[in-house]
Amino acid sequence: DNTFATPALQRPLEHGADVVVHSATQYLGGHSDVVGGIVATSDEELAQRLRYLQNAVGAVPSPFDCYLVLRGLKTLDVRMERHSANAAVIAEALQAHPQVERVRYPGLESHPTHRVAARQMSGFGGMVSFECGGGEAAALEVVSHTELFTLAESLGAVESLIEHPGRMTHASAAGSPLEVPASLVRCSVGIEDAADLVADLTAALDRLP
């Protein structure tokens, strides 16, 4: 699944992957106005089987949805550069904040797989998550008091989003090995001014006791 990185930052087929999937709803479309998905392979035989299945089950997007994704692809490179640059600034700022216990961003040298990401990616993307030292209550307080970051699920669009995975996107994983920490906050960093985004998150964190 190359949704978070997109072909602009990482090309899994060049690293030996047989099949790569993308949610075109996210960065490829990039504007929160289309729903779609893409399956890519360099194996022609497999590609023919996929085309047959697509035709047989009717999983065909509308012409207008295709237009929206193609429009998004025209600006994909410049958007991903800005997403990555903004996310790097935000990750560094979060790492220095006393209310933040841990920051998860592959662009940070502290990330356990930073070396792998640096080797196979040309940028580190726009997804940043962090754990609040004050636990779930602190995380819920933060996501409820940002102004530029919109409290919403989804990701990968030009606007910045913030959410509490334990209560939102990953709620169904509660009680399973895939359960996320209750103190976790996830940010889909947009292309707004980085200083404004840092100030927004800092203000929300500074509210915490």
Where do the language-model regions lie?
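A common structural junction motif
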Residues: 57-58, 146-154, 204-209
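Residues that form or flank phosphate/diphosphate-binding pockets in enzymes
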Residues: 7, 137, 196
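Conserved PLP-enzyme active-site core in the AAT-like
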Residues: 1-99, 104
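Conserved small-domain helix->loop->beta segment predominantly found in fold-type I
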Residues: 88-147, 153, 170-179
